[in-house]
C-alpha cells in the first residue's frame, strides 16, 4: 500500500510539472503547411497547399529539385536540393491564461527569416549561429492566429558565407532550408542553465607562458577539426544524445578539444561537452578576407560573435573563440573585434583566426594563443617556422618535414614555437601555439561505405571513384588499396602527433582529421569515416597510445639500425594528466620473434615533457634483417582501463657493405641496351632500373596531402611542383623478393630510401590481370596502375624492372638490404615471371603514352 501511495504521488507530481510546462510553452513541432517560393511571389497569408514536418528541412522532407544521378565528385549529392525562399505556415492557439503575459517565438536554428502573424510582418532575423527569438506579445493575443515563417537560404547573409562557412557549405552540412531543433512559443525567454559539476578540464582554465593550464595543472590540447559532417541529415544534430555519441567517440580516441571550423555548434553540443570535459572553440561563420570596408560583412560577423558569446558563453566547455578560418585582410579590424568580444566575455581566450594569413604574419598583439601551421614566413626549402609535419607541395617544399627528412623520432617544432611572440616584444611574451589542421594524410576510400548513406545525402562521388577504378581494371584491389593506404596513414598520423608531443613549448594540435571530410574534392583523410565509424585501421586503444594525457615517447635518430651499431635512443614522457608519475616504473621491452631485451626506468614527478632515461641495446646477435617492436609501458597507471603504453616498429640489418659479388651474377642496367638485350636472348636475367620518363610519377613517401585535385590546381596556379599524388605501396610480404627485407603489405619507415629514389611507372597498358610485385597506389582522380617493381619473361630471358635507383638507396642500411634482397631474388630459382611479353611489346609499354582522364580544376578560398 505504501509503495502504491508513493507511486501515485510521483505520478501526480510528474503530471503537475508537465502541465506547468505546457502552460508556459507551446511545442510547434509537427505538420506545417508549406510552399516553395522560387519567384518570390507568395504573400503572407496566401494558402499553402503542401505540407512539411518540422523540425526538419526541405531535404529531409524531399522537397525541391530532384537529382536522380550525378557525376559530382566535389562533395556528396543532395537528391533533393533547394535554394531560395520557402514558406512554413500553421495555426496556433494562444490559451486564455496567457493573457497579459509576454509571448516569444523560439526557433533554435534556421536561416534568415521573416515572421508573419495573421498576414502582418512582425519580425525578421538573420541569426544563423544561435536561436532566433521574437517577442510576439502584441500580435499573439489569446485565441487563434495564423503563424507564417518565410525562410530564405539564398539571401539574407553576406555573399561570402555561401561558399566558405561550414554553416552554409555544400561540402558538409549543406545549405539547407528549414527549421531544426526546438520550435516553440513560450511565455518567457529561455534561461541559460549552467553545468552542475565543473569538469577538471575547465577549472581555472588559463595561460601561463606558452601553455594552457586547468585545475592548477599543465594540459595539452589534443584536438580535432569539426566541419559539421552529419551525412544522414545534411544538417547539424540538435539533440544532446547525438552529441554525447559524437563526443563520446572523440573522447574514446583521446580527444579533449574541438575546433569548429567557421561555424558554431548548438546548445546540445556544449551540454555534452560540459559532461565529457572537452574544450570547445567555436568560430565566427566565416572564411575569407576580413574587409574593414565591407560594412555589411563586418556588422554581420560582429553581431554573430556577440550572439555566440551571450548564448553559449555560460557553458564551462566554451573556453576559446576564433574569428574564423584562414582569414586575411585587416589585422587592425581583427584586433578591434577581439577587444569588443573580451568586454562581453572576459573569461574566454581569443585568437584572430585559425591559421590567419596561413601563419605568415606571425603573432600579433591581442592574441591569447596562436593556431597555425607556421610561425611567420620561411625561405622555400626551410622548415624552421613549421608547426605541423605535412603540407601540400604548394605550401611547403617537398610537402613538409615528414616526407622530406630521413625518418626519425627526434623531429619537433621547437624552432617554430620559439618565434611565437608579438612583434616588438620579447621571448618572455611568447603565446601558446596550437598546430593547425595537423596531418591530412589521405586514405583510399572504402566503397562498402556507400550503403551507409540512407539519408538526405548520397555518395555519387564514391560511385564515380569506384567506376573509375573498375574502368582501370583494379576494382578487385579496392579493399587492399584502402587497407594499405590506411595503415600507412595511421603511422603518419602517429608521427605528426608525436612531433607535437616532443615539442616542449607546443600547446596542442587540431587534427584534420579523425573523421573523413566528404567535400572539397572528397578528402578521405580520416581514421574514421564520415559517420565517425571505424575504418578497421586501428582500435581506440591503439590510437590512444599516442593520443592520451600521458604518452611515453621514443626519441631516436632513426627507425632502422645496424647490428654493428646497436640501438641508442632516449625515452621521453609527455605528462599532461594532472597526476604525478613520481616513483612509477616505465617498463620497456624490445621483441622480435621473442624477447630481445628489457629494462625499467623510474619516473620523476615532472609535468609536461621530460626525458626519462637512455636506451643502449646490443643488436650484434642479429645476422639477418629483422623487424622488431619496442614497447614502452608505465605501470600502475590507468586510462580507459589500461596502462599508458606506446609501441614502435623498428628494424635491424647486418652491416653489409659489398654487394659486388651478387651484382656480378646478373646484368644490372639503367637502359635496355644491346648488352641487356643480348643477355635476355641468351636466357639470362636482367635487372633494369630505368631513368624517369613522362610515363612516371615521382616518389612520394607519405600518402598524398588532403586532396590531389585541389592542390594540383593550386600548385599549377602558383607555378609550384605538383605532388606525385600517390598513397603508398601495396605488396605481398610473403613474396620471395622480401626474404631479406621484412615488410608489411603497406609502406613503413624502412621504405624511405627506396621510395624517395623512385619514379613509379604507369602500367595502364598492361593486361587487366597484370599486377606489379610492388604496386604504388594512385589517387582517386588518376587511377593509374603504378609499378615500383615488376617482372616479365621475355623470350628465354627474365627481366626484373625496378623503378628506383637502388644504388642511391644503398647509402642507408635498409636501402642496401633491399638492394641485396632484390639481387638475391633475381639470382634464385624463385625468380620465375609468369607474364610473357615480347621485347617489342615491352619497349612499347615503356614508351607508349597512356590515356589520361581530365582532372577538373578545384580552387581553395585561402590565398596561397
Predicted regions and their residues:
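Accessory carbohydrate-binding/adhesion or oligomerization-edge regions at the termini
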Residues: 16-72, 146, 150-159, 178-185, ...
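N-terminal carbohydrate-binding accessory modules
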Residues: 23, 195-250, 650
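Accessory beta-strand-rich segments of carbohydrate-active enzymes
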Residues: 28, 34-39, 78, 83-190, ...
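Beta-strand-rich binding/interaction modules
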Residues: 103, 115-117, 196-198, 565-604, ...
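Substrate-binding/catalytic cleft of secreted carbohydrate-active enzymes
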Residues: 257-527
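Aromatic-rich peripheral "rim/lid" segments of glycoside hydrolase catalytic domains that contact
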Residues: 344, 512-577, 850-853
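Catalytic beta-strand/loop cores that center a nucleophilic Ser/Cys/Thr
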Residues: 403-419, 695, 712-813, 830-864
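Short alpha-beta junction capping motif
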Residues: 664-709, 796-798, 802, 822
Amino acid at each position: 500500500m505504501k509503495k502504491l501511495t508513493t507511486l501515485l504521488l510521483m505520478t501526480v507530481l510528474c503530471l503537475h510539472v508537465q502541465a506547468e510546462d505546457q502552460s508556459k510553452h507551446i511545442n510547434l513541432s509537427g505538420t506545417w503547411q508549406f510552399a516553395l517560393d522560387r519567384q518570390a511571389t507568395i504573400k503572407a497569408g496566401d494558402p499553402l497547399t503542401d505540407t512539411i514536418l518540422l523540425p526538419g528541412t526541405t531535404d529531409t522532407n524531399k522537397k525541391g529539385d530532384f537529382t536522380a544521378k550525378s557525376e559530382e565528385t566535389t562533395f556528396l549529392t543532395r537528391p533533393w536540393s533547394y535554394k531560395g525562399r520557402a514558406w512554413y505556415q500553421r495555426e496556433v492557439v494562444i490559451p486564455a491564461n496567457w493573457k497579459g503575459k509576454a509571448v516569444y517565438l523560439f526557433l533554435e536554428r534556421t536561416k534568415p527569416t521573416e515572421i508573419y502573424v495573421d498576414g502582418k510582418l512582425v519580425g525578421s532575423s538573420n541569426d544563423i549561429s544561435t536561436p532566433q527569438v521574437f517577442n510576439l506579445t502584441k500580435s499573439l493575443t489569446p485565441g487563434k492566429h495564423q503563424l507564417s515563417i518565410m525562410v530564405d537560404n539564398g539571401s539574407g547573409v553576406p555573399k561570402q558565407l555561401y561558399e566558405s562557412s561550414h554553416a552554409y557549405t555544400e561540402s558538409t552540412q549543406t545549405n539547407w532550408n528549414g527549421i531544426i531543433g526546438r520550435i516553440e512559443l513560450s511565455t518567457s525567454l529561455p534561461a541559460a542553465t549552467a553545468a552542475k559539476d565543473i569538469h577538471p578540464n575547465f577549472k581555472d582554465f588559463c595561460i601561463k607562458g606558452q601553455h594552457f593550464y586547468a585545475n592548477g595543472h599543465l594540459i595539452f590540447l589534443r584536438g580535432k577539426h569539426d566541419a559539421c559532417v552529419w551525412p544522414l541529415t545534411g544538417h547539424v544534430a540538435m539533440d544532446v544524445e547525438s552529441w554525447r555519441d559524437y563526443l563520446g567517440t572523440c573522447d574514446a580516441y583521446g580527444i579533449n578539444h574541438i575546433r569548429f571550423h567557421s561555424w558554431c555548434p548548438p546548445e546540445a553540443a556544449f551540454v555534452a561537452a560540459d559532461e565529457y570535459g572537452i574544450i570547445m572553440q567555436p568560430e565566427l561563420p566565416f572564411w575569407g578576407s576580413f574587409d574593414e570596408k565591407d560594412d555589411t560583412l563586418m556588422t554581420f560577423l560582429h553581431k554573430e560573435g556577440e550572439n555566440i558569446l551571450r548564448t553559449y558563453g555560460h557553458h564551462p566547455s566554451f573556453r576559446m573563440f576564433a574569428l574564423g578560418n584562414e582569414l586575411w585582410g585587416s589585422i587592425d579590424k581583427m584586433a578591434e573585434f577581439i577587444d569588443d568580444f573580451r568586454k562581453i566575455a572576459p573569461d574566454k581566450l581569443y585568437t584572430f583566426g585559425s591559421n590567419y594569413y596561413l601563419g605568415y604574419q606571425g603573432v600579433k598583439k591581442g592574441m591569447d594563443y596562436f593556431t597555425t601551421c607556421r610561425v611567420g614566413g620561411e625561405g622555400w626549402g626551410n622548415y624552421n617556422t613549421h608547426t605541423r609535419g605535412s603540407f601540400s607541395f604548394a605550401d611547403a617544399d617537398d610537402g613538409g618535414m615528414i616526407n622530406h627528412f630521413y625518418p626519425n623520432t627526434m623531429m619537433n617544432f621547437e624552432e617554430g614555437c620559439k618565434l611565437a611572440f608579438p612583434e616588438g616584444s620579447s621571448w618572455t611574451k611568447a603565446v601558446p601555439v596550437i598546430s593547425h589542421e595537423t596531418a591530412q594524410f589521405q586514405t583510399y576510400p572504402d566503397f562498402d561505405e556507400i550503403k551507409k548513406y540512407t539519408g538526405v545525402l548520397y555518395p555519387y562521388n564514391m560511385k564515380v571513384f569506384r567506376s573509375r577504378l573498375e574502368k582501370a581494371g583494379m576494382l578487385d584491389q579496392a579493399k587492399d588499396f584502402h587497407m594499405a593506404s590506411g595503415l600507412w596513414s595511421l603511422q603518419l598520423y602517429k608521427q605528426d602527433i608525436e612531433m607535437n608531443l616532443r615539442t616542449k613549448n607546443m600547446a596542442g594540435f587540431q587534427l584534420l582529421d579523425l573523421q573523413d571530410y566528404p567535400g572539397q574534392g572528397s578528402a578521405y583523410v580520416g581514421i574514421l569515416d564520415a559517420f565517425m565509424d571505424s575504418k578497421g585501421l586501428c582500435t581506440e586503444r591503439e590510437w590512444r597510445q599516442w593520443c592520451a594525457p600521458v604518452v611515453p615517447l621514443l626519441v631516436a635518430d632513426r627507425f632502422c639500425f645496424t647490428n654493428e651499431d646497436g640501438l641508442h635512443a632516449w625515452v621521453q614522457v609527455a605528462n599532461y594528466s594532472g597526476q604525478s608519475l613520481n616513483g612509477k616504473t616505465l617498463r620497456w621491452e624490445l621483441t622480435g620473434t621473442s624477447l630481445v631485451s628489457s629494462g625499467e626506468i623510474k619516473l620523476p614527478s615532472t609535468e609536461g615533457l621530460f626525458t626519462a632515461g637512455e636506451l643502449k641495446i646490443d643488436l650484434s646477435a642479429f645476422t639477418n634483417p629483422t623487424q622488431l617492436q619496442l614497447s614502452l609501458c608505465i605501470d600502475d597507471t590507468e586510462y580507459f582501463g589500461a596502462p599508458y603504453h606506446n609501441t614502435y616498429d623498428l628494424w635491424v640489418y647486418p652491416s653489409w657493405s659489398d654487394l659486388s659479388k651478387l651484382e656480378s651474377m646478373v646484368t644490372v642496367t639503367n637502359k635496355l641496351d644491346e648488352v641487356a638485350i643480348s643477355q635476355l636472348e641468351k636466357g639470362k636475367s636482367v635487372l633494369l632500373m630505368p631513368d624517369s620518363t613522362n610515363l612516371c610519377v615521382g616518389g612520394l613517401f607519405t600518402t598524398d596531402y588532403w586532396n590531389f585535385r585541389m592542390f594540383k590546381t593550386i600548385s599549377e596556379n602558383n607555378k609550384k611542383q605538383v605532388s606525385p599524388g600517390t598513397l603508398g605501396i601495396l605488396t605481398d610480404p610473403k613474396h620471395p623478393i622480401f626474404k631479406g627485407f621484412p615488410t608489411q603489405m603497406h609502406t613503413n619507415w624502412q621504405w624511405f630510401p627506396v621510395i624517395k629514389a623512385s619514379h613509379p611507372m604507369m602500367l595502364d597498358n598492361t593486361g587487366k590481370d597484370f599486377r606489379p610485385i610492388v604496386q604504388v597506389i594512385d589517387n582517386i582522380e588518376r587511377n593509374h596502375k603504378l609499378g615500383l617493381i615488376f617482372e616479365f619473361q621475355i623470350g628465354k630471358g627474365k627481366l626484373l624492372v625496378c623503378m628506383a635507383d637502388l644504388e642511391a638507396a644503398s647509402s642507408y642500411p635498409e636501402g642496401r638490404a633491399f638492394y641485396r634482397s632484390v639481387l638475391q631474388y633475381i639470382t634464385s630459382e624463385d625468380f620465375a615471371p609468369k607474364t610473357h611479353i615480347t621485347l617489342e611489346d615491352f619497349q612499347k609499354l615503356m614508351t607508349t603514352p597512356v590515356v589520361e582522364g581530365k582532372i577538373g580544376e578545384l580552387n581553395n578560398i585561402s590565398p596561397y
